[in-house]
Amino acid sequence: MLRSRTVHAGVESPFAWWRLATAVVLGAVGSVGMWSVPVVLPAVQAEFGVARGDASLPFTLAMMGFAFGGVAMGRLSDRLGIVAPVVCGELALSVGYIGAGFAPNLFSFALLHIVIGIGASATFGPLIADTSQWFSRRRGIAVAIVACGNYLGGAIWPPILHHFIAGEGWRATHIGVGVFCGLATLPFLLALRRRAPMHDTESMGAWSAGVQRGLGFSPNALQAVLCLAGLSCCVAMAMPQVHIVAYCGDLGYGVARGAEMLSLMLGFGIVSRIASGFVADRIGGVATLLLSSALQGVALFLYLLFDGLASLYVISALFGLFQGGIVPMYAIIVREYFPPQEAGTRLGLVLMATLFGMALGGWMSGVIFDLTGSYQAAFANGLMWNLVNVLIALWLLMRPGRRVAHA
């Protein structure tokens, strides 16, 4: 009994909430690895004299690094604690960005974004998995809040990067980001030294029984379905997030307006993620996934209908408000339908699929633009991929074995 009380003493304690706040800050800093390419894309394309699809390659490789890095960093966190992957991640960001600032050609610039993606991955999935171990009744909102770190960074980084790229050039900006990432996170590591509370045997047994009942799938089959859903939704999600800056430049509004729309999109994504946590605690992760995915499709359809400056600002805000809760729902579903001793690996695999979707979507949209000379077909392509995710979520929701689990 004494051991049990000691193990669980930190769950939903003030210290747990302090760790949550720390994780949000680290997630915001590390997320620069995801959001810098959309801002720098026009400048890199112009300097290296390449096509739009080729200029999108660094984002694709960054997402691949993020995907594989998330699994590797998650395993490192399981074995050594969360501090080890965070330190490795920030070092990778520093090396990647400083190296990218000196890149002589697009090929080396793109390859260094694999390192950047690996670094950024340490401040997303592993922090979400670690945070979920510190909460029980409020796990939904806790996971949603820590996932906001990524979008908080997405709201902050684009205008900062645009300012320095315009004034100092993209090379000096990348070097500066690398130095900042290496120094800014050091004070926050002390708050993460304590290992997460472990679950007792009785709790693990209850989760294992729940997995056998949940959705009528075997664990591996459910894993595959969730990975397909994650891939599909993020192919659709990547079109506006990766290309909105270039899209505004092509329409004659200027890349600064596009950077503002990206910040607006991701800022409203923060609201969406927090709201989705509250909703998921009431109706479950699967139902919330369906709702968010359907609304994302509505926003993509609106991009097909309107391209005025004011309209794009409004639609970008709606897109952020609608889609921000999608990715955190996969974390909630994993916690609902898989035992805690498997959650880190299962979540890492689903997040890897979502990041493959972002990588594929970013590259595919650039290629479609090169082939058609317009982003209209790229938006339509995203809408079709989004429909796949909606149908999967609807199918899961209608499964006779569906349940809502509360840890």
Where are the model-predicted features located?
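Paired small-residue
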Residues: 96, 107-115, 310-318
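Extracytoplasmic gate region of multi-pass secondary transporters
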Residues: 37-41, 221-278
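Helix-loop-helix hairpin linking two adjacent transmembrane segments in secondary transporters
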Residues: 146, 150-196
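Conserved MFS/SLC helix-loop-helix module at the cytosolic interface between two early adjacent transmembrane helices
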Residues: 68-106, 280
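Extracytoplasmic
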Residues: 18-52, 73, 157-158, 239-245
